[in-house]
């Protein structure tokens, strides 16, 4: 990241802001999602999301996508697709969102997780950034064991793109042991 920090072509996200968005539900506003609905998302999603097996996320490779973002690749073995499926079954709003998601086709969900590191600013040379990233295309960052899925609000402010992420709920992934009693 140090190679990119002083480049006018790129705005880097602060490390505490790094995350994986496994389903983007909408915007917190009266015409999309109201705050009163957020609790129902948790209540409806949690029993299903607990069924997802804990997994290890393999993080490797720096790349550029959509001509606008720089990201780390993440291999979850399909676990986030399973979480998306469970959330869709439990939460009508997620069902509606995924019904219109171009990543969900008749052949299945093609979602692949990634961790956005930064975004192009529109200034300078994109080729210069890609050249700086070339040595890191096959970078192996490591493995991260995941035991919880989070429901969070990512604040988007015009004056500050990286406000603290507001975690609304953390849901333990229990896999086959999800039937083992009360979990809240």
Regions found by a protein language model. Name each.
Residues 1-184:
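Histidine-dependent nucleotide/RNA phosphoesterase domain, centered on the 2H-phosphoesterase fold
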């Amino acid at each position: 990241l140090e190679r990119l920090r002083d480049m006018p072509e790129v705005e880097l996200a602060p490390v505490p802001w790094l995350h994986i968005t496994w389903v983007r539900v909408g915007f917190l506003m009266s015409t999309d999602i109201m705050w009163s609905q957020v609790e129902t998302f948790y209540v409806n999603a949690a029993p299903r999301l607990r069924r997802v097996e804990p997994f290890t996320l393999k993080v490797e490779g720096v790349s550029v996508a959509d001509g606008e973002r720089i990201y780390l690749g993440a291999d979850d073995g399909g676990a986030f697709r399973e979480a998306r499926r469970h959330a869709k079954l439990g939460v009508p709003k997620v069902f509606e969102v995924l019904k219109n998601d171009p990543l969900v086709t008749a052949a299945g969900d093609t979602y692949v997780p990634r961790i956005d590191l930064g975004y192009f600013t529109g200034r300078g040379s994109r080729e210069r950034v890609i050249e700086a990233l070339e040595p890191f295309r096959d970078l192996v960052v490591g493995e991260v064991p995941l035991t919880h899925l989070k429901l969070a609000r990512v604040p988007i402010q015009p004056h500050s793109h990286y406000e603290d992420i507001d975690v609304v709920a953390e849901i333990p992934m229990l896999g086959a042991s999800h039937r083992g009693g009360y979990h809240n």
